[in-house]
Design a protein with these regions (language model features):
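A structural motif
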Residues: 75-80, 128, 219, 283-284, ...
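Short, ordered loop/turn segments at secondary-structure junctions
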Residues: 57, 85-88, 114-117, 133-144, ...
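Catalytic alpha/beta core domains of metabolic enzymes, predominantly
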Residues: 149-161, 165, 169-170, 192-344, ...
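Conserved, mostly hydrophobic/aromatic
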Residues: 52, 113, 181, 224, ...
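Beta-strand/loop-dominated core regions that host nucleotide or nucleotide-derived cofactor-binding catalytic loops
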Residues: 402, 617-620, 627-651
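Active-site beta->alpha loop and helix N-cap motifs at the rims of alpha/beta catalytic domains
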Residues: 78-209, 352-475
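N-terminal amphipathic alpha-helix/helix-capping segment at the start of soluble metabolic enzymes
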Residues: 16-54, 169, 173-175, 311-361, ...
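Short, acidic/polar
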Residues: 61-72, 116-121, 271-275, 373-379, ...
Length: 656
């Protein structure tokens, strides 16, 4: 099967791939076979474990503060410490930071983070173990201009890049320094954008241009990354990168990260949707979870994500499915038929599990977005209100909103209650006589067979609740969707995941975001049903809507694209993010970027509706999409000015 991978503007730069083997086996867990790259005392790629890294948030010129923070990170599990070096003076001070760490007994490799300043990179490469460069701004300036290149002028630009980049490569060769070539979706050069657009293909070509220069100079100590704040784009870019590397005989290690993931639950969900999906594919040799929190808080999250794969290869074997109807390089929604308000063109639905509760009262539904006003005898319904409630054997003795469906086990089904539907197991389904009424069928992936497909094709009122007990859950479920699609079974499918064995709330967040988000990102599934014994009903509902928000399949709240703080940051990111969120969190569907400096400014906010960017000490610049609209605003008044800007463009509504 041939896969079309598109550039944004000119079809002549589209490419066709005759293979989609971004992993050796999309059904059974196998790690991507990358070459080993040495970074100081540790190996990355090859047979090495997946490494954990993070980045300091201190001023690089404050040696002791940077050392103390680095130690906290290392003791939390950080195996590579990245430090910003925006100019030569910061690059020079890396030597002092390294010396102090060694004096205290810490030999963890250091990584210099470079933007715009080749001379800083060249100096850093002589002092520490690794440098990171962004091909979008190492040799090019970004003016957001679309430039028409002939083939001759485009090649001459590549010659200019080679001239600018080659000195760093030669220094790295001489000193045994490793390099990460890290593309960011939001900071592609105008040259790349003019040919490929802000596409995964553009991200891949941006990095490979630099890799080809390295290979021409016989330098191979390279690690690659394809970061984006949108997990869909990030996943597609990494998969495409692996295939393109295979075509060119490369197998460099991969560093995984979702850039500007944010804070709290949202940051963890978005990170797991992106990073976790690729780890399921066996991709990834190092990981950073980018949270707008203290950097030492990132390590436990990354470790929980990575540790899930230590023994994954022992899972029950999954049978391959042919043909594969899923395009791994482009998002396509697989539309099912519609039953009730599930499937068809409806947004994915959320089912809340109340089956473990001893009793259910009107006030119990507050946790899933329904607030009863007794004095008015009315229900207020929030944007993140569950669509269905599963009662199991329980009953309700009060009236509920008409928008909330009730699912009960067949033996306890209150068939006289409106909006009440039975949940059947496979044996019950085979003998169920009322298939003209909407009903739910809970099955395991291994229950699927031709006889069941035949029954389902004839049953226009059945919603499938699909579950698995395979340790390699997401690919097992993906294989089931492939079988259903190939067998022309068009019933809507709810993705059911049970995490009763987990005792850690954060693990439930991360695992569910990986398992369910990975499927939604491939256009699979018409709803979410999470069961566990760890989260309360409110947290589980919030997690479900958070996964839908992160996969952009159902928007129920404001989205914040906020970078993790670093030494370039010009204000307190955590405090500022909290202030912006407090004023704007009711603006459903808006995306607001909060960036600590101009490096992570307009580029990384490419996807945002509004931007709040530090451009000097105590000074903020506001953006509408990519355009600067207000400059040099004192930070004391900047949140008020942001609210006024949102009002000016007609996107403001008063809080309820």
């Amino acid at each position: 099967m041939r896969y079309l991978v598109k550039s944004a503007f000119q079809s002549k730069f589209d490419i066709y791939l005759d293979m989609a083997n971004y992993t050796k086996d999309i059904f059974n867990y196998t790690r991507y076979e990358s070459r080993e790259v040495r970074v100081g005392k540790i190996g990355i790629g090859g047979n090495n474990p997946i490494r954990i890294q993070s980045m300091t948030t201190t001023d690089t010129m404050d040696t002791m503060a940077t050392v103390e923070q680095s130690i906290r990170m290392i003791e939390a599990g950080c195996e590579l410490v990245r430090i910003t070096a925006p100019s030569i003076k910061e690059a020079r001070n890396l030597e002092n930071i390294k010396a102090e760490l060694l004096k205290r007994g810490y030999d963890t490799p250091l990584v210099a983070d470079i933007h715009y300043t080749p001379k800083a990179a060249e100096l850093a490469a002589t002092l520490i173990e690794k440098v990171r460069v962004n091909p979008g701004n190492y040799a090019d300036k970004k003016r957001f201009e679309e430039i028409e290149y002939t083939e001759e002028t485009y090649l001459s630009e590549l010659d200019r890049i080679r001239e600018r980049f080659s000195p760093l490569v030669n220094i790295c060769k001489e000193h045994g320094t490793a390099m990460r070539i890290g593309t960011n979706h939001g900071s592609l050069s105008d040259r790349i954008l003019s040919r490929f657009g802000d596409t995964p293909l553009g991200m891949v070509e941006s990095a490979l241009e630099f890799v080809r220069i390295c290979e021409d100079l016989d330098y191979h100590q390279i690690i690659l990354s394809m970061k984006a704040s949108n997990p869909k784009i990030m996943i597609e870019a990494y998969r495409l990168l692996v295939v393109k590397m295979q075509e060119e005989g490369m197998n460099y290690p991969l560093h995984l990260g979702v850039t500007e993931a944010g804070e709290g639950e949202d940051g963890r969900i978005k990170s797991a949707v992106g990073i976790g999906t690729l780890l399921e594919d066996g991709l990834g040799d190092t990981v950073r979870v980018s949270l707008t929190e203290e950097p030492e808080f990132e390590m436990p999250v990354a470790i929980k994500l990575v540790d899930r794969y230590k023994n994954r290869s022992g899972h029950k074997k999954i049978e391959a499915v042919e043909p594969n109807p899923i395009d791994p390089f482009e998002y396509n929604v697989f539309r099912s038929a519609s039953v009730l308000n599930i499937g068809g063109t409806n947004v994915p639905r959320v089912i809340s599990d109340y089956s473990h509760r001893d009793a259910i009262f009107q006030c119990s539904l507050i946790n899933i977005g329904y607030v009863y006003k007794e004095e008015l005898d009315k229900w207020n319904i929030k944007d993140n209100a569950s669509d269905y409630i599963y009662l199991g054997k329980n009953k309700l003795d009060f009236d509920i909103p008409g928008t909330l469906g009730v699912i009960q086990d067949l033996a306890h089904w209150d068939e006289n209650r409106s909006n009440s539907y039975p949940l059947l197991n496979l044996d019950e389904y085979r003998t169920f006589k009322r298939k003209h009424l909407p009903h739910f069928l809970k099955i395991m992936v291994d229950d699927l067979n031709e006889a069941l497909y035949d029954l389902l094709r004839k049953d226009a009122q059945c919603v499938i609740v699909l579950s698995t007990d395979n340790a390699h859950a997401m690919p097992h479920m993906r294989a089931a969707f492939m079988r259903l699609i190939n067998s022309k079974v068009n019933n809507p499918v709810l993705i059911f995941r049970n995490y009763d064995e987990l005792k850690d709330e954060e693990c439930v967040q991360l695992y569910a975001s990986t398992d369910i988000g990975g499927l939604l990102n491939e256009g699979l599934g018409q709803g979410i049903w999470i069961s566990d014994k760890c989260l309360n009903c409110h947290s589980r509902n919030s997690l479900s809507f958070g996964i839908l928000q992160a996969t952009r399949t159902r928007i129920s709240k404001t989205e914040y694209i906020s970078c993790p703080s670093c030494g370039r940051t010009l204000f307190d990111l955590q405090e500022t993010t909290a202030k912006v969120r407090a004023r704007t969190q009711h603006l459903k569907g808006l995306k607001i970027g909060i960036m600590g400096c101009i490096v992570n400014g307009p580029g990384e906010m490419a996807d945002a509706d509004y931007g709040y960017v530090g451009t000097g000490n105590g000074v903020i610049t506001l953006y509408k999409e990519k355009e600067v609209v207000k400059r040099n605003i004192p930070s004391l008044h900047a949140v008020d000015e942001l609210v006024e800007l949102i009002k000016q463009y007609g996107d403001w509504v008063d809080p309820a």
